[in-house]
Amino acid sequence: MATRYWLMKSEPGEYALDDLKNEPDQTEHWDGVRNYQARNFMRDDMQVGDGVLFYHSGKKPEVVGTARVVRTGYPDHTAWDPKNNHFDPKSTPENPIWFMVDIKFESEFKAPIPLKALRDVAALKDMILLRRGNRLSVMPVTKKEFDTIVKLGGKK
């Protein structure tokens, strides 16, 4: 299957690119996604080797680097822990509702690319992220969009 590309959002105060970079083996599971469409992307579509744009959301939304999918979708165990912020009493190990993937740090951009700057790039005019009202935390991007953003960011 051909490589696909994704944008994954995270609040930098919760989990930043530096956190991924500092994980053992620079790898971590992407848990806590509680939107059905984003869940379906992770469960059904993401494959090992797919490229990821790591996006810091919040007060200063910006793309900060890249990662790779290193494990396909599997049940998100945080949904089963009542002490976890992502707990969902309807999800069980026997009937999981939520899924996650594992990603591995790949690169940090020399300069983060703010959302506002992305809006000014003609090659990105159709990007899902830039559509009004889009709040998905995981979304597909085209190879052209991925390559354009990586080129803009430059690797450290």
Predicted regions and their residues:
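Aromatic- and Lys/Arg-enriched surface recognition patch
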Residues: 66-136
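Compositionally biased, charged N-terminal/linker segments
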Residues: 1-48, 57, 145-146, 155-156
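Surface-exposed, flexible loop/turn segments at secondary-structure boundaries
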Residues: 13, 60, 75
